[in-house]
Amino acid sequence: MIDADRLITATGGRDRDEQMDRAIRPLSLADYIGQPTVREQMELFIQAARGRSEALDHTLIFGPPGLGKTTLANIIAQEMGVSIKSTSGPVLERPGDLAAILTNLEPNDVLFIDEIHRLSPIVEEVLYPAMEDFQLDIMIGEGPAARSIKLDLPPFTLVGATTRAGMLTNPLRDRFGIVQRLEFYNIADLSTIVSRSAGILGLVIEPQGAFEIARRARGTPRIANRLLRRVRDFAEVRGNGQITRQTADKALNLLDVDEHGFDHQDRRLLLTMIEKFDGGPVGVDSLAAAISEERHTIEDVLEPYLIQQGYIMRTPRGRVVTRHAYLHFGLNIPSRMGEIPVPDDFGDEPVDL
């Protein structure tokens, strides 16, 4: 199985990589690159909330892994001038776990819950009145003597992040006043991100070197920064330490990341669909078994970018590869492909929302 954040994933050094991720993470909306609509809207909402000395409305951020949901949550707290408490859905197993965090919040603080779609139903029930009325219902005692008491909470902002917005219950989703979807980044914005990260890390990088890394980063800043670190290793060991286009190209070829940003696992998925399932349609469970992966890995990690780039389509009967997949491997396009519709805009293809 592959890591959900993969490097395109190199093993080892994960702790150090995470420390570097924190070091290069933007701290303000002014430094936040890409997502112009989200940035403009959040700047407006934050300015309005600060002007009224109120907590920002509860905010839901969703999109594929690595696009900056956690970064945006931290920026919200920074711009609001408040503290942020971070946790995740799977960690909050009991209502008491959530209550302990909520009762320690200061007025207007931000509570960030990653993977919010994985909250247990019993914890979610406690969260509803906390979000809506800033009150916490707690049961005291047991059996016939049990009674419920209400504790007042300070106003706070819940920022929830998820890759699976479609798995949120309607009552929870409806309680978010602000909903933001993060899209895959274009190459120009990723090039800017790579150049900025290189500057923070003290690396010498040419614009074409940044472009080469950006165009293979699957539209994802997290992957772009990881590729930058691996290209840096290559440049220091087999070059003069400077990252040029040629250096980046050689390093990424060594990492088995092709010009489209596909790694071994992406190519394996596409070839399995072509060779074992005649291009599809194939169900996700059958596909997961064929490549020895978990269903959620295919749905959350592999598929979104392949769909957005137009290599895979979802149909009522299952997944189908498009002409682009055959052309990518230099294979002849089957005559029956003329019967398979190709979306006009793959960027609008819904991905588990």
From Swiss-Prot:
First-tier enzyme category under EC: hydrolase
Organism: Pseudomonas syringae pv. syringae (strain B728a)
Cellular component GO terms, alphabetical: cytoplasm; Holliday junction resolvase complex
Principal subcellular localisation of the protein: cytoplasm
Sequence segments annotated as region (Head domain (RuvB-H)): 259-353
Binding site for Mg(2+): 70
Gene: ruvB
Reactions listed under catalytic activity: ATP + H2O = ADP + phosphate + H(+)
Record's subcellular location: Cytoplasm
Quaternary structure note: Homohexamer. Forms an RuvA(8)-RuvB(12)-Holliday junction (HJ) complex. HJ DNA is sandwiched between 2 RuvA tetramers; dsDNA enters through RuvA and exits via RuvB. An RuvB hexamer assembles on each DNA strand where it exits the tetramer. Each RuvB hexamer is contacted by two RuvA subunits (via domain III) on 2 adjacent RuvB subunits; this complex drives branch migration. In the full resolvosome a probable DNA-RuvA(4)-RuvB(12)-RuvC(2) complex forms which resolves the HJ.
Name of the protein in its database record: Holliday junction branch migration complex subunit RuvB
